[in-house]
Amino acid sequence: MQARPPRVPVTRDLMLLIHSHLNLADPDSAMLWAAFSTAWFGFLRVSEFTTPPSGFDPSIYLPISDLMVDCHLHTLGVLLLIKASKTDPFHQGVKLFLPCTCGMLCPVASLSAYLHHRGNSAGPPFLFTDGTALSCLHVTGRLRSLLADAGVQGNFSSHGVWIGAATSVNGAAFPTHSSELSVISPATPI
């Protein structure tokens, strides 16, 4: 049996490259960028922000109503309620704060721009203009095609976004606990 090639992390530099290869005036591209930047800054696994083939269940998966963007003049960030994840087997949920970074990779700016196109109708947060929900296969396929179009070779997968975010924090010499600073326990009042 052949060993699977190692998954390549989607680093900050690759995120910038992805950003430069998307036409953000296109609503579907704006949606992909919002999903990628949300996942990267939130250290999200693909199952925490996409819809599975079995369909969307708002009691388990992230609905648009659990994504709160502070749209005031001085936006502080976005609050997500992740209801279930691999690291939350009892589905207690966790509140996750994504800060405004005021840079090209800012998850708040990308979500605000995308939500302008999407509107606030019920359902999963990340929808293509034809109403199809973003899935793991979409994330992996688009990630691979965007990076291939940019001339980047590698075994990229949706998990590479999570790995890349963690690698970037580690490589930036943040204290070990910094990658956990954006997580707010379920009991924390907001």
Model-derived regions, located:
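Extended, non-catalytic subsegments within catalytic or DNA/protein-binding/adaptor domains
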Residues: 1-190
